[in-house]
Structure formats: C-alpha cells, structure tokens
Curated annotation (Swiss-Prot):
Keywords attached to this entry: DNA-binding, Nucleus, Transcription, Transcription regulation
Lineage top rank: taxon: Eukaryota
Full protein name: MADS-box transcription factor 56
Record InterPro entries: MADS-box/MEF2_TF, MEF2-like_N, TF_Kbox, TF_MADSbox, TF_MADSbox_sf
Gene that encodes it: MADS56
Length: 233
C-alpha cells in the first residue's frame, strides 16, 4: 500500500507547532553534524525559533569563520558574474551596431543608385519617396540660407547708405566753413587803388591822402611843427 504524501502547511495549533519545531530542529542539527563528519564538509546552520531564540551549528572552529568564507565567495562570484555579463553585453551591442552599420551602408548604396538589381518595385518606390523627401529638405535648407544671406546684404546696404549720408553731411559742412573763411579774408584785406581808374586832380588828392604819412607826436601845442622843421632842416 502506497503511503500518501502529506501536504506541508503551517500548523495552526501553537503547542503542536512548538513540539514539531523542537523535533525537526534536533533532527536538522543532527543531519548537519552527520554531513560534516561523513563528507568532511564545512557546514554552518542558523535557526531562529518562532519566539526569536537562536540555534546554531558550525563544523568549523567558529560560525563567524564560515560566514566570512561565504561572504568572500559570494563577493568574488558576484563580481565575476557581473564582469561576464558586462562582456556579453558589450558583445551584443557590438554585434547590433555592426548590423545597423551594414544596413545603413546598404541603404546608402541604394540611394546612390547602386545594387538595385535585387530590389522590388515597392522597394524602388520607397527609395524614390526618400529621394524626393531628401530633395525637398535640401531645397528648404537652401532657401533658408539664401534668405539669411539676402537679409545680411540688405542690412549691410542700409549701413553703407547711412555712412554715405553722414559723409555727405560732413562734406557739406566743410564746404560751408571754407566759404565763410574765404569771405572773411576778402572783406578784411587792405584796399588798393584800381588800375583801370584814371588819375585826375580829385583822384590824385584821394591817392595822396592814401599815401600821407602820419606821425604821432606828444608835447605842447605849437612845438610839433618846429620840431618837424628842425628835423627836416
């Protein structure tokens, strides 16, 4: 008669649960001891009861030694596993990039009109649409650049016209200043007898009057003439 398999589930009765824990715990500790002795294995066992009481077993001189060994092993294993995962990820990324580059190169060749022998009508239509879209974008960019250049040239033209107007204003100011200076020089120059006017008795007197020498004399009245006569004598 085959014995039925007992379903494992939590024991609801606290007393029964505590009795079962004590029996199973002792059996587990015994099995751990037998495993370490029979197989020369380093075994460590840590058990906490439902009430929080600690039970432990270690085949090594101390449980901490086994725990430290476990930490060192898991650390090295995790690091090695991480490195292997990183290497595999790099390989996968490299392979994916190589496939993308190959596809891009193939697409470039087809756009340039190369390797079209194996293309279907749908593929050729798709290439045609891509080319038309590319040409449209190129024309838009070209128009944008031309508009920018025209705007810069117009701005430069406005600047040059403004500078030219400023220079004309300065030139007009210089001409006006030169005319004023010439007029002032003409009006302040000494008068000379015109060569075309004939010399008559009246004009001769006027000419003599222009040639009269004047002397400044300081002294008593009546002494000026005597002084002049003595000088001429």
């Amino acid at each position: 008669m085959v014995r039925g398999r007992t379903e494992l589930k939590r024991i609801e009765n606290p007393t029964s649960r505590q009795v079962t824990f004590s029996k199973r715990r002792n059996g587990l500790l015994k099995k751990a001891f037998e495993l370490s002795v029979l197989c020369d294995a380093e075994v460590a066992l840590i058990v906490f009861s439902p009430r929080g009481r600690l039970y432990e077993f270690a085949s090594a001189p101390s449980l901490q030694k086994t725990i430290d060994r476990y930490k060192a092993y898991t650390k090295d294993h995790v690091n090695n596993k991480t490195i292997q995962q990183d290497i595999q990820q790099v390989k996968d990324d490299t392979l994916g990039l190589a496939k993308k580059l190959e596809a891009l190169d193939e697409s470039r060749r087809k756009i340039l009109g190369e390797n079209l022998e194996g293309c279907s009508i749908e593929e050729l239509r798709g290439l045609e649409m891509k080319l038309e879209k590319s040409l449209h974008n190129i024309r838009l960019k070209k128009t944008e650049l031309l508009e920018r250049q025209i705007a810069k040239l117009k701005e430069k033209e406005r600047t040059l016209l403004k500078d030219n107007e400023n220079l004309r204003g300065k030139h007009r100011n210089l001409e006006a200043a030169a005319l004023v200076a010439n007029h002032m020089t003409t009006t302040t120059a000494p008068a000379a007898w015109p060569r075309d006017v004939p010399m008559t008795s009246s004009t001769a007197g006027a000419a003599d009057a222009m040639d009269v020498e004047t002397d400044l004399y300081i002294g008593l009245p009546g002494t000026e003439r005597s002084s002049n006569r003595s000088e001429t004598g």
